[in-house]
């Protein structure tokens, strides 16, 4: 019995140290990764080098669980010599995922947000607003499961002839309870 208790204690300590958030379905609780990844892009020609950053979050409120990805970006140079079209396509796919203890992630809901016009029209965007938030449909919260947000970004740079590039981003910390 003592070995089982110590093993449970050790496992719990590792989980808590790993950044797990505990939730109550009645209270609003969020679990966001400080940074879920970024993409530094050097464009052809005189378009400004830019950094695109992402943050995945999972949220529980009023018995529902939601996942979203925020995207911000900035120029890495002082002046943009060419403000022309930078992308033929820029899409973020956000997934709400669940897992049982010791299991693997299962996608519950997913959505793809087309941000092509927004990233082409704005050389930078640092605000966290609904326009740059890709929100997957919510699901009924089950406190016996672990929940997370995961995402990927797919983009096609105008004029580089490389086609669509897809990058998997780091998921949010797990939310449980």
Language model features: what each stretch is:
Residues 1-28:
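Secretory targeting and sorting signals
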Residues 27-177:
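Post-signal peptide N-terminal regions of Sec-secreted extracellular proteins
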């Amino acid at each position: 019995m003592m070995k089982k208790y110590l093993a449970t204690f050790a496992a719990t300590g590792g989980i808590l140290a790993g950044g797990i958030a505990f939730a109550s379905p009645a209270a609003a609780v969020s679990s966001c990764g400080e940074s879920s990844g970024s993409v530094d892009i050097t464009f052809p020609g005189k378009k400004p080098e830019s950094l695109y950053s992402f943050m995945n979050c999972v949220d529980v409120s009023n018995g529902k669980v939601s996942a979203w990805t925020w995207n911000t970006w900035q120029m890495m140079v002082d002046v943009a010599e060419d403000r022309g079209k930078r992308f033929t396509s820029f899409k973020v796919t956000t997934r709400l995922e669940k897992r049982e203890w010791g299991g693997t992630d299962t996608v519950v809901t997913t959505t793809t947000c087309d941000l092509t016009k927004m990233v082409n029209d704005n050389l930078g965007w640092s605000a966290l607003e609904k326009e740059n938030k890709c929100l997957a449909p919510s699901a009924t919260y089950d406190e016996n499961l672990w929940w997370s947000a995961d995402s990927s970004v797919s983009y096609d740079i105008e004029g580089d002839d490389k086609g669509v590039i897809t990058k998997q981003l780091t998921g949010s910390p797990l939310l449980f309870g």
